[in-house]
Amino acid sequence: MERIKELRDLMSQSRTRGILTKTTVDHMAIIKKYTSGRQEKNPALRMKWMMAMKYPITADKRIMEMIPERNEQGQTLWSKTNDAGSDRVMVSPLAVTWWNRNGPTTSTVHYPKVHKTYFEKVERLKHGTFGPVHFRNQVKIRRRVDINPGHADLSAKEAQDVIMEVVFPNEVGARILTSESQLTITKEKKEELQDCKIAPLMVAYMLERELVRKTRFLPVAGGTSSVYIEVLHLTQGTCWEQMYTPGGEVRNDDVDQSLIIAARNIVRRATVSADPLASLLEMCHSTQIGGIRMVDILRQNPTEEQAVDICKAAMGLRISSSFSFGGFTFKRTSGSSIKREEEVLTGNLQTLKIRVHEGYEEFTMVGRRATAILRKATRRLIQLIVSGRDEQSIAEAIIVAMVFSQEDCMIKAVRGDLNFVNRANQRLNPMHQLLRHFQKDAKVLFQNWGIEPIDNVMGMIGILPDMTPNAEMSLRGIRVSKMGVDEYSSTERVVVSIDRFLRVRDQRGNVLLSPEEVSETQGTEKLTITYSSSMMWEINGPESVLVNTYQWIIRNWEMIKIQWSQDPTMLYNKMEFEPFQSLVPKAARAQYSGFVRTLFQQMRDVLGTFDTVQIIKLLPFAAAPPEQSRMQFSSLTVNVRGSGMRVLVRGNSPVFNYNKATKRLTVLGKDAGSLTEDPDEGTAGVESAVLRGFLILGKEDKRYGPALSINELSNLAKGEKANVLIGQGDVVLVMKRKRDSSILTDSQTATKRIRMAIN
């Protein structure tokens, strides 16, 4: 108060007032403070001060032609005086208003294209539904999540090249667009952004949002796909949650989801084949997800899931160093151990050989519905702090931790024999045997574990053997916490190796993953998964096997035709015929195979009986090990649609129907492709078959006498030449071969040579 009074007194004296209001500021320190550097020191003040002036804006001289000097109200929009120190014009804020109302308009067509991610977000929110708000304790755990819906999965470098190519196509600098997705995106964007007037830098920023996955390590309770993360601030607080259903899906979430399903299916299928690793690679390379090659997606997509990581390891890609056990991701946070083989006895006196981890270690365990911190010593659980969504999830985590601890009381709790097998009917390793056993029934395990009184610790509570919470007692060493355990945040990737049984190890030889860890959960993929590998045909049931087998034969008919005549045994052993065998009734397989093979042999031996359609139709039946019998069949049975359906040996049936007019084959009513019979198979086909064993030398040569009919040919001696009458009354010169070995190629060359000789 005192100082204000003093100031008032001072201001009342006109000389002081003059000094305070008119004198220039010439104190060096003050001048320095406000003038050094480009950074504005007091932007708010500067803005107020500028806007209080009549002409706070400067503009290019051209503005004088584009804007009138005065607006409709007669207010001046720009001053004729030049801006000091530049040749720009001083402009009033009113000019901006005039420009916005009356200035030129530009096309808005590119805005939705450039700001695509925002426009799509608005649509999702518009169509999303927000449900009620619930107040309850939120168990949030930090997970690495995708915060940018609707992106492609390019690496930063790949995206940079695409952006440079699209936005600054004429800039110098080496840009190599290699991947399929890079090329597709570049082409698409160049077309979309033709004649785009939006500032290139803006376009570049927005393209980056569209092309690159951005992840953050955020506390989440609930959905982790990017369409949930974009509304995280609306759906979960510290003590509340709001139900939300997104108003649309985005491709990146669909890719992640479909990739997991494809990888699980492939790993499960590979496990049961003779060489799992080779099969897995073959399937990964021949599978497409939403029209993009699975191997390209695996290289770019950071999804961490057991099956996906096994596929990545097989391709030689780096994966996370954490390991998986019982569906939980374990990350060692401190301590170390050495491994030693040890024999232990179960409660049923069965001997198990387990690899014991000797030493003190601490782990974080993260699962879909529960998380935990585990401290253990050699074959002893010291402490487990677990949190989860519900009783069931907490129990799952406790079982996994108890088995992982390798404690004796756990092994002694086994009742009955352990003989669990995997899909390929091989016994599981001892640790997974124990896990499966207790996952089925953990009552004895929990009863035998032992309980202890507990101290009252904030946020912690005990849990009894029947999985009910308790404040005084708890299972030995085990506590339930309100707080979740964060997922391992590091994105570090390590080099791993994989053996032919798909066990993935780090460089120290620790097993990180194995097919036993792959979830059995079935889901429906959001994007179309196309498995081109014959190993995956059975995934969609018997009909798919049938259609795929015939489609494969038709696609490869040229190669098959040659093998059919030259090396049938090799053809019958092709793995593409394996799935088909499961459709043929077990009792009939060998008989059918013997019958068809004999029939084919007759076709090879007896002239004029080569029949493309029949060979294609019966070929899959010849793949089973044959039984030599004299049995004849007029139809062969396949088990589809829940019952036996017949394939007629001669003629069409609902299973196999060839339309001669359209030259198309339908299998169970589905189109299986177009089939070109050997040209004019009725005649030329017969001739090419007949002329096997004969070399066509060219046009008719009168020196070799009158033309013989095809039937008279059989009387020629080896090496003898003759004219022969074929098809439409044309005559060609042939010679009977001296050796039988080359007979096989004749059918193919005969047709071509007949044409050449005639023309």
From Swiss-Prot:
Recorded GO CC terms: host cell nucleus; virion component
Extent of the signal sequence: none
GO biological process: 7-methylguanosine mRNA capping; cap snatching; DNA-templated transcription; symbiont-mediated suppression of host gene expression; symbiont-mediated suppression of host mRNA transcription via inhibition of RNA polymerase II activity; viral RNA genome replication
Chief localisation class: virion
Family matches, as Gene3D superfamilies: Polymerase Basic Protein 2, C-terminal domain
Disulfide partners: none
Annotated site location: Avian adaptation: 627
Motif window: Nuclear localization signal: 736-739
An MF annotation (GO) of this entry: RNA binding
Keywords: Cap snatching, Eukaryotic host gene expression shutoff by virus, Eukaryotic host transcription shutoff by virus, Host gene expression shutoff by virus, Host nucleus, Host-virus interaction, Inhibition of host RNA polymerase II by virus, mRNA capping, mRNA processing, Viral transcription, Virion
Subcellular localization(s) per the UniProt record: Virion; Host nucleus
Entry similarity comment: Belongs to the influenza viruses PB2 family.
Task performed by this protein: Plays an essential role in transcription initiation and cap-stealing mechanism, in which cellular capped pre-mRNAs are used to generate primers for viral transcription. Recognizes and binds the 7-methylguanosine-containing cap of the target pre-RNA which is subsequently cleaved after 10-13 nucleotides by the viral protein PA. Plays a role in the initiation of the viral genome replication and modulates the activity of the ribonucleoprotein (RNP) complex.
Quaternary data: Influenza RNA polymerase is composed of three subunits: PB1, PB2 and PA. Interacts (via N-terminus) with PB1 (via C-terminus). Interacts with nucleoprotein NP (via N-terminus).
Protein name as annotated: Polymerase basic protein 2
Organism, scientific name: Influenza A virus (strain A/Gull/Astrakhan/227/1984 H13N6)
Gene (UniProt): PB2
